[in-house]
Amino acid sequence: MFAWAGDIDQKGNDFLAVIDADPGSRTYGHLMATTVTDQQTGQVHHTEYTMPASGMLFANDHVAGRTFVFDVRDPLHPKVAVSFTEMAGYSHPHSFLRLPNGHVLASFQNAHAPGTGAPDAGMGISGGLVEIDDQGQLIRAASTADPKFADAMLMPYSLLPLPGIDRLVVTNSSMHDIDPIGHTYQIWSLSSLKLLRTEYLDTGGDQDGDVNPEEPRLGPDGSILVQTLNCGIERITGVATDHPRAKLVHMFPGSHCGVPTIVGHYLVQSVPIINGVVVLNLANPGKPAEVSRLELGEGLAPHWTGWDAKAERVVVTGIGDLHRLFMLKLDQKTGAITLDTAFHDADGKVGFNFDNRQWPDGWTGSANPHGVVFSR
């Protein structure tokens, strides 16, 4: 697997770490290689969620506003194929999803002020969607601005292409604390990249479960489940109709929940306040039920989760003082989630250590991992 990481002191550079994720290997959990970029760490952030068929992996440093395309077809020798910053007047991309044609559709958070080449004060309230090929070349782009929602925060955070019904669901939430709070999602025509409508999410009364919608995922019944920063799960139905509907169907404890993963009819959610993850049963998607949870220890605020269908494992990274990556086992029949204690670094401790180690490129220091992608 490939873990995108950066120096916690922001003095070293962003790098891609290759870790043995094969449970049958004698070096399961060990570092195999690293590829270092020329980018001093700002904030390593999202990679793609799953490995693309092309083996050309997008990974972003959000503060730097720079995205790298790694060629990982030779998994033990990844290399930077190309990098880019702004495109079509938009900057600071966040999420990267593949289209049926193999291109990436990326959510760029910020739009430049007309004619200035610089962001508006406060980074603006809208951004853009940009289609990009594996060579980092612009294909097409469209603004998320909606004159009917002129006062709303419409900075795209993530997106979910639905080619089977020619729709695209986009969530609006900012990475910048100075910007207004997001409460909306958008439905687009995927083929024409045309905005069809902007809609508000369900607040859930006084629960504020709609605050800053982030990650949309396709549920097992075809509805869209959206995780929010305020730890809500919103369920959107009717996206192919003129009357889509959002309903808050679950609230996790705390706030700042991160990247969820759906496996079959289970949703795995990182929940920082418990220093762990919670699993929901989606058999009744209108009323998900918790079936298990796992605490990973103080010092880790889990954020990213990802699924490896080959090894049947969930990977977890986070922020905080515990700079470790963990692998979890998910029972796909019961939803029970447990720590994979067989996954350990050369130090013998459970998990992969990013703290105060000497890396193959000669750098010694501590790193924060963020996005993690499994090889095919």
Task: Indicate residue ranges for each PLM-predicted region.
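Short, conserved, GDST-rich strand-edge loop motifs in beta-rich repeat architectures
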Residues: 2-10, 106-126, 170-184, 319-332
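Beta-propeller domains
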Residues: 4-42, 47-82
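Short loop/turn segments immediately following beta-strands, especially the blade-tip
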Residues: 18-27, 69-78, 133-138, 187-196, ...
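Beta-propeller fold detector
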Residues: 27-37, 79-86, 139-146, 195-202, ...
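Beta-rich, blade/repeat-based domains predominating
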Residues: 38-52, 87-99, 149-167, 203-224, ...
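Asp-box/WD-like beta-propeller blade repeats and closely related beta-sheet repeat scaffolds
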Residues: 72-163
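Loop/turn-rich, solvent-exposed surfaces of beta-rich toroidal or solenoidal domains
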Residues: 253-332
